[in-house]
Amino acid sequence: MLSAKGVSLGLGLGLGAWGPVLLGVVGVAGALALYGYYKNRNAEPAAAEAV
């Protein structure tokens, strides 16, 4: 766990402390994209029926 270089976060990506940050940003962006996709997909039939 602890080495001469510092604390390893264990992602094995070679990104150091930025690994979890980038993973979190990618996760949040993916969740927002899926949320937007499902929200728009479910809204289309209702909009088509209203016309």
Curated annotation (Swiss-Prot):
Region (LG region): 9-16
Membrane topology qualifier: Single-pass membrane protein
Compartment(s) of residence: Magnetosome membrane
Record key words, sorted: Biomineralization, Magnetosome, Membrane, Transmembrane, Transmembrane helix
Residue ranges, Cytoplasmic side: 30-51
Transmembrane found in the keyword field: yes
Topological domains, Lumenal: 1-8
Residues that span the membrane, as ranges: 9-29
Reported modifications of this chain: May undergo N-terminal cleavage.
Similarity section: Belongs to the magnetosome MamD/Mms5 family.
Miscellaneous comment as given in the Swiss-Prot or TrEMBL entry: This bacteria makes up to 60 cubo-octahedral magnetosomes of about 45 nm in diameter which contain membrane-bound crystals of magnetite (Fe(3)O(4)).
Biological function: Might be involved in magnetite crystal growth.
The protein, known as: Magnetosome protein Mms5
Source organism (scientific name): Magnetospirillum gryphiswaldense (strain DSM 6361 / JCM 21280 / NBRC 15271 / MSR-1)
Gene (UniProt): mms5
